[in-house]
């Protein structure tokens, strides 16, 4: 089975529209783009188009590529103070002279659309999932939507980034999966992946995972986006692995749409949290 990320994202967007209607106002998302990275510009356009579809008011703040740290932090602090901005997203990567960790820590935890703030990451590790990284949240949503029994399952994640691998491991542990986290430095990677019932690959290595590394009937989520001979491919040898997997996400059209849809959901969550604070 091909796991259609676009179809799942459409379901999420329908849920988000209903939540926006119940709120009675349009939540606000502010994105910050530093520089003119073409890929980042494309991702920003995709996110703002998605906001428009579900009734989220969005604005994009573009800063020059030579923006200094002080200016970026002040821009974020200004958005923190605005009542009409419920969620803030800092588009990564930043230019090399800027420290993404300092910038992320400047975002108010209550407005942290990406779930990268240490306070939100800490809550996740303690089992309190408030605002969490969007890609892991999308993967967990897909597993639950497909009726996969996460509890007790053998889950292997290839990739230990702060964006995908680490937070996804915490989310799966919170649901009582048995989790292994591997990476490109793992010795004998096949020995780990071949028994996985849930396999998530986010290593940034084109077609790293071959068919003989995958268990029959596994659910495989390919987070990789790589360019090979002008084509976009993932970290999984899709054509070979799809014959063995119970479900597999394509690249493109798999995890990417889920990530964007979860950004919308988290923006509404941030607005709902803001409303609760006002009422209490």
Swiss-Prot record:
One of its GO terms (molecular function) is methenyltetrahydrofolate cyclohydrolase activity. Its EC number is 1.5.1.5, 3.5.4.9. This is Bifunctional protein FolD. Belongs to the tetrahydrofolate dehydrogenase/cyclohydrolase family. The lineage of its organism: Archaea, Methanobacteriati, Methanobacteriota, Stenosarchaea group, Methanomicrobia. Catalyzes the oxidation of 5,10-methylenetetrahydrofolate to 5,10-methenyltetrahydrofolate and then the hydrolysis of 5,10-methenyltetrahydrofolate to 10-formyltetrahydrofolate. SUPFAM superfamilies: Aminoacid dehydrogenase-like, N-terminal domain (SSF53223), NAD(P)-binding Rossmann-fold domains (SSF51735). NADP(+) binds at residues 159-161, 225. It comes from Methanothrix thermoacetophila (strain DSM 6194 / JCM 14653 / NBRC 101360 / PT). Pfam families: THF_DHG_CYH (PF00763), THF_DHG_CYH_C (PF02882).
